[in-house]
Amino acid sequence: MDASSARPTSPTEPLRIAVMGAGAVGCYFGALLARAGHQVTLIGRPAHVQAVQQHGLRLETAALDVQVPMQASTEASAVRDADVVMFCVKSTATEEAAREMQPHLAPGALVLTMQNGVDNDERVRAVLGPSVAVAAAVVYVATAMAGPGHVRHFGRGELVIAPSALSEQVARQFGAAGIAVQVSPDVRGALWAKLVINCAYNALSALCQLPYGPLVQAPGVADVVDDVVAECLAVARADGVTLPGDVPAAVRGLPATMPGQFSSTAQDVALGKPSEIDHLNGYVVRRGEALGVPTPLNRTLQVLVRLAPSRVQASQAPRNPPQNS
């Protein structure tokens, strides 16, 4: 069966969904889908899985605070029988996670790559081969894990996904669960637009351990952000990518909409975890090298984040800050 063959499911029948990499993003969307009647299995770390198995997933938003009964597992084999796999691992773990789940995927399953960066769908497709349907998804949501089995939502919650045999059905079913989904043939442009925003703020927030509002108020930071964005846009143009909307305006407006938010890279650095910097600013650097476009600021930010202390004092670390996936 090739990737164009959809798994036979009724347009109204509940979906079987596996979340590969059950962090804040996957848990939030998974909880909404489970509340809507879909069969959702979270695949994550032992402490988180144990909490969900014992108590369900605690979903905390501005409007509600509920326990959502869900299945959970630490094993990649739990993707078996899933109609849709929400692939939410860090970009640093893409190939490894894809290899782990490959033997267990059901024929006709759709893998949605819901990650930072612009090439995860290509990397997953290279591992899984042409027989598996893989569609990129752009995620717009602010969420954070407040502890094992506890996800907090701070704002937004939309997806833009690439076309596939199942994408329209997924959009309808997700929409009925309260998740706004747009199926777009220009997901690459949307992924790049989000990449530019991430390149502008993620590294700076991580290096300074500051949320976006105070960060951009510091003298000179706004100019640095503008220069980083200019480099990214130059690489995108050279790569033949058309970005939707006014990306520089979106970058400038972000701190006002979420002034208290730390970047996901800031949280990774604070906790001593591997960051995705090589798939954010580092990706722009690599494409710039290949296309002959200089990217000195993006390179500097990439190197500095790599050199950042592996762990900061607990008093300096952000306390469960919302993460802009």
What kind of region is each of these model predictions?
Residues 2, 175, 226-325:
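NAD(P)-dependent Rossmann-like dehydrogenase/reductase catalytic/cofactor-binding core
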Residues 2-64:
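NAD(P)+-binding Rossmann beta1-loop-alpha1 motif at the extreme N-terminus of oxidoreductases
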Residues 72, 105, 149-159, 209-215, ...:
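Helix-loop-beta segment of a Rossmann-like dinucleotide-binding subdomain
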